[in-house]
């Protein structure tokens, strides 16, 4: 019942949140699977955090109350800690991982951990920064420089001829070094500012050699008017592209144009707005494709109208049961001016969760009904789907259930999916592939990341220290590898298929 869908928040005597017990805990009082747990030190600083189904994370602060060490469950298995080193102004200058003992890490609270910038290519990863706290086997992921451009002559930067700044950058980030997780390389970058502390030029090395340069011009209000991107490869060959932005009197974006090298400029998109500031029209590709948007009095989107596709969304009107809470009661769409309308009527439970999507065609959705219905047969108290039925095309002229799924969980983590449907989608259409029948078909690591999906024949998923997937391995020997920088930006994808690799 609604009355029993309770979530409990428990605080200590100082008002700090120490437990969050969601509705699932009321029926299954397992703190490890369901509870959010927080602990604090005598200064009310968070020192322990545990999320449901995950190993706890530890946080350590120095005498200046700054986070200097943290450790999650996966790092604990490898006896690693993340470290953060600050300058005298409290800005992070070095981040990475180290192998300090737990006992040694705890002593950081007795001192102020500072990073001092030294002359020459010394210190952590030859960055010039020296930590006042001893770090065991440090692996540096991020280095930040501030205020000046003296770093240009340091190790790594000198190979790219970064220019000197002409405007004072006091108080701003001027340069950085980011490691590339999955390789031994580094990315070197520098930012240059105008007198209003806005970045007007940004230079960055590339993992495969060469440089990327972004030059930005601003309006008086601070909105970018143009961005010139110059890509130079390792041989010195350059390509340029320029994005130009136009705004109306309310600083709303109205036009975006793109120019590649010396080719004619192309209008990518043009926006118009109504009297209430809502997006009214989009025109793409020099105005060839236009899309109009309609809203109701509550500013809810009610219609999309274009030359190739149109859609209507209904909340309190239309063919479904009226919904006054923002849920869509029904929707219809057409792919082309003369196409037959198709659509769904939606039903929800008393908590606003979708239970049924009934398909139909024609103005009243009364033709070819139920062909592509979807039905959620149940939810648990955490809002997880327990059962799902999907209908679809099963033969050239027939339609039936293609998925009859039963989902099992361990806490909030999906454990098993069983498909009781005896039919398959026609012509290799989309459906769930029940690849295996085991008590546990999905596995997770200490941080809650998925490590196996046996229904998709994924035997292992490896993650980097940012909890981003670095490699996905399949039972047939195929794999996908990802390369990221230390900021989490994906730089490269390598697909290995039957021994052949494709890099993008």
Predicted feature locations:
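C-type cytochrome heme c attachment motif
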Residues: 16-19, 36
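Short, small-residue-biased leader/transition segments that mark boundaries at the very start
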Residues: 3-10
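Acidic/glycine-rich beta-solenoid
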Residues: 24-36, 49, 53, 75-80, ...
């Amino acid at each position: 019942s609604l009355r029993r869908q309770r979530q409990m928040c428990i605080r200590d005597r100082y008002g700090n949140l120490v437990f969050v017990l969601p509705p699932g805990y009321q029926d299954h009082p397992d703190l490890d699977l369901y509870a959010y747990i927080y602990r604090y030190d005598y200064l009310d600083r968070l020192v322990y955090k545990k999320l449901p189904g995950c190993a706890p994370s530890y946080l350590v602060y120095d005498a200046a109350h700054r986070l200097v060490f943290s450790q999650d469950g996966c790092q604990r298995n490898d006896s690693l800690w993340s470290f953060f080193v600050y300058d005298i102004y409290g800005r992070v200058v070095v981040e990475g991982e180290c192998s300090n003992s737990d006992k040694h890490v705890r002593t950081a609270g007795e001192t102020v951990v500072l990073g001092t910038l030294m002359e020459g290519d010394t210190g952590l990863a030859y960055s010039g920064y020296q930590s006042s706290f001893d770090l065991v086997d440090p692996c540096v992921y991020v280095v930040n420089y501030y205020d000046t451009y003296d770093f240009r002559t340091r190790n790594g930067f000198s190979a790219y001829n970064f220019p000197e700044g002409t405007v004072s950058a006091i108080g701003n980030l001027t340069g950085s070094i980011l490691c590339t997780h999955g390789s031994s390389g580094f990315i070197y970058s520098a930012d240059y500012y105008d007198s209003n502390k806005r970045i007007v030029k940004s230079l960055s090395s590339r993992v495969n050699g060469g440089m990327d340069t972004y030059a930005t011009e601003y309006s008086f209000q601070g909105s970018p008017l143009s961005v010139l991107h110059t890509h130079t490869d390792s041989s010195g060959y350059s390509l340029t592209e320029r994005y130009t932005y136009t705004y109306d009197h309310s600083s709303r974006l109205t036009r975006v144009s793109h120019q590649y090298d010396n080719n004619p400029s192309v209008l990518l998109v043009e926006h118009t707005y109504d009297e209430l500031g809502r997006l009214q029209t989009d025109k793409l590709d020099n105005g060839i494709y236009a899309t109009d948007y309609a809203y109701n009095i509550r500013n809810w989107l009610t219609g999309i109208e274009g030359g190739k596709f149109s859609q209507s969304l209904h909340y309190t009107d239309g063919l479904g049961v009226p919904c006054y809470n923002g849920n869509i009661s029904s929707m219809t769409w057409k792919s082309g001016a003369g196409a037959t309308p198709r659509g769904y009527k939606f039903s929800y439970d008393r908590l606003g969760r979708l239970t049924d999507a009934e398909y139909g065609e024609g103005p009243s959705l009364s033709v070819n009904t139920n062909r592509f219905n979807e039905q959620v047969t149940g939810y648990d108290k955490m809002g997880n789907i327990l059962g799902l039925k999907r209908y679809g095309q099963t033969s050239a002229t027939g339609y039936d259930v293609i998925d009859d799924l039963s989902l099992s969980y361990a806490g909030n983590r999906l454990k098993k999916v069983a498909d009781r449907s005896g039919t398959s989608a026609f012509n290799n259409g989309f459906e769930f592939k029940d690849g295996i029948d085991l008590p546990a078909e999905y596995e997770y690591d200490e941080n809650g990341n998925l490590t196996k999906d046996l229904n998709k024949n994924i035997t292992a998923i490896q993650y980097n220290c940012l909890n981003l997937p670095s490699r996905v391995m399949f039972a047939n020997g195929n794999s996908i590898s990802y390369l990221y920088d230390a900021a989490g930006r994906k730089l490269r994808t390598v697909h290995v298929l039957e021994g052949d690799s494709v890099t993008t």
